[in-house]
Amino acid sequence: MKYLLDLILLLPLLIVFSIESLVKLFIPKKKKSVAGEIVLITGAGHGIGRLTAYEFAKLNTKLVLWDINKNGIEETAAKCRKLGAQAHPFVVDCSQREEIYSAAKKVKEEVGDVSILVNNAGVVYTADLFATQDPQIEKTFEVNVLAHFWTTKAFLPVMMKNNHGHIVTVASAAGHTVVPFLLAYCSSKFAAVGFHRALTDELAALGRTGVRTSCLCPNFINTGFIKNPSTNLGPTLEPEEVVEHLMHGILTEKQMIFVPSSIALLTVLERIVPERFLQVLKHRINVKFDAVVGYKDK
């Protein structure tokens, strides 16, 4: 009975906070300044990471750029410098924990304390479970989620000391709703979303509310990693559109960034509608892409 009473007493807060959220939809939140911040972006040698670096370069930040591809990261750094920013490229394999820690030490010594960390590096293998090799599964988790632990452990302490900073997790809509033939990828992105949510709550529990968190969850992006993607949710997203949403989310300190926003509705439906209806809905959404299928029906 006591718990029921406590729940009833919380209802006014639910109403107030719901109205507050509704009002915020129509009143744009002021964007914060990131001038002078040291921004580290993993996977900055191409795609979302590269375009995100360009946007931060326009905002008077100092950039630390990580990627496994030396040519790609140097091209990104050169463009960032043309945009007026200091850019420090590092060749780093984000699947290797000790390499991450070693590079983090160099960053602190040569550049300074990172105050905005964008965990963007990622890999994807489009295949069913049987066609996905064991090393590919390991690599998927090493890059897509374990690297987030290592980079955050390296750079978060100073942010917590200053009660100032921002940790950005680049995840995926596949971190909320599953897609066949992306088993390893979906699993790793669910873990990345969980990392973001758990870290957010942990920072709050420790009283470090000045360290903000954001998580990007887009639909299919036209970056070439997944071949011939299509879905009835809409056209394949262009990287520029996704980065525009990402930057807006970071600068307004939005915790969960869905692109398109309809993804948020789908994640809610998955939790409340009957499973049979959900299967019909997924059939109508009709997600397609080129994939390798190793299972043979004998």
UniProtKB/Swiss-Prot annotation:
Subcellular location: Endoplasmic reticulum; Lipid droplet
Gene Ontology, cellular component aspect: endoplasmic reticulum; lipid droplet
Major localization class: endoplasmic reticulum
Gene3D superfamilies the UniProt entry points to: NAD(P)-binding Rossmann-like Domain
Tissue spec: Expressed in the liver (at protein level). Also expressed in the intestine and, at much lower levels, in the kidney.
The family this protein is said to belong to: Belongs to the short-chain dehydrogenases/reductases (SDR) family. 17-beta-HSD 3 subfamily.
Protein name per its UniProtKB record: Estradiol 17-beta-dehydrogenase 11
Gene: Hsd17b11
